[in-house]
Amino acid sequence: MREMYPKKGRVILHVDMNCFFASVEIAHDSSLQGKPLAVAGNEKERKGIIITCSYEAREYGIRTTMPLWEAKRLCPQLIVRRPNFTLYREASFQMFQILSRFTEKIQPVSIDEGYLDITDCYALGSPLEIAKMIQQALLTELQLPCSIGIAPNLFLAKTASDMKKPLGITVLRKRDIPEMIWPLPVGAMHGIGEKTAEKLNDIHIQTIEQLAKGNEHIIRAKIGKHGVDLQRRAKGMDDREVDPSQMGQHKSVGNSMTFSKDMDEEKELLDMLQRLSKSVSKRLQKRTLVSYNIQIMIKYHDRRTVTRSKQLKNAIWEERDIFQAASRLWKQHWDGDSVRLLGVTATEIEWKTESVKQLDLFSFEEDAKEEPLLAVIDQINDKYGMPLLQRGSQLLRKQEKSFQQKLESKFM
């Protein structure tokens, strides 16, 4: 199959999952197959917007970022699911695991897309055959559809994957650029947003062809060096390489909660922080992962966002340790103002088998005693789907909260 690969240059695939969140929901619940489905915010709140929707929903004119009330007007029978980011992250993890069977040269771009450099993968088949194998594996094993672009560089591969959806495979060569890409408006080009398109329009650049053939000095003067990079890509030139080191950056496990109303009660916020820590812990343990860095995110009522992280000497994975790190960050950085969103994320992830928790003399005996107990508590709670068993510290905090509420209701 070596003859199917270029003697010089590279072969890049861009794998882009189709309607990812909606597709994951359908894979999780087959009764949604073939029906208009949207993943969106709370139906009861008019502020809810469409995060993504199925192709059946798009036939009614429903689009991403559309207000939910408008989507329901266009399609009264629209099925709405609240976003389940735990489910989506798990599906993303499985997706990249499948991609890693074909090559180690993988660069995640987001939760649902990534680049693969298959230049040296000729033993597996032609580029088109490899793309078909990837597409079939994702569809068979995860019930998730994707589109794949095949090209000599990252920009063209990304452009190609957008051309046929769903379940498309598109080959885009440099010689195809004048016919397939140049006639398009500059706003349709990957990497050009609305504001950049407006600036290019100001200097009479309307199409990608005009960008490719435009005066470099005028373009640079208008939008800087980024404009020159865009011009090179419009000509089909892109020297960026697939960066496998970003695969590690993709490995983060996090959960966040947006509150229906602003919260400023510290005990309630700490209780939520512990629930988020527990969720992160369970997902780490499910994947046999550990973390060396814990991060919290606080979004205030006025949309101010604070993100802080703590580097850890030892790898952690248990709820107790994650919550301890998160709560310390919280106490250091919460300014007392009311909060709309709270998040906990474990980063700098490694496989647990590759990492050893370095226990000091005082923590070793305590951890050794508690690990079997924590495992039993988690198993029983998971089996019955509810927190039947809890640690004493959790119960004590709940009792304090209940007692406080009774006092408030009696004397206020």
UniProtKB/Swiss-Prot annotation:
Q: Which terms in the Gene Ontology molecular function aspect does this entry carry?
A: damaged DNA binding; DNA-directed DNA polymerase activity; magnesium ion binding
Where does the record place the site Substrate discrimination?
F21
> What's an example GO BP annotation here?
error-prone translesion synthesis
Q: Where is the active site?
A: E113
Q: Where in the cell is it found?
A: Cytoplasm
Q: Which Pfam families match?
A: IMS, IMS_C, IMS_HHH
| Cofactor binding description | Binds 2 magnesium ions per subunit.
UniProt keyword terms in alphabetical order: Cytoplasm, DNA damage, DNA repair, DNA replication, DNA-binding, DNA-directed DNA polymerase, Magnesium, Metal-binding, Mutator protein, Nucleotidyltransferase, Transferase
Q: Which residues cross the membrane?
A: none
Named cofactor requirement(s): Mg(2+)
- What is its quaternary makeup? Monomer.
Q: Which family does it belong to?
A: Belongs to the DNA polymerase type-Y family.
Could you tell me which PANTHER family the record lists for this protein?
DNA POLYMERASE KAPPA, DNA REPAIR POLYMERASE UMUC / TRANSFERASE FAMILY MEMBER
> What name does this protein carry?
DNA polymerase IV
The record lists the organism as Bacillus anthracis
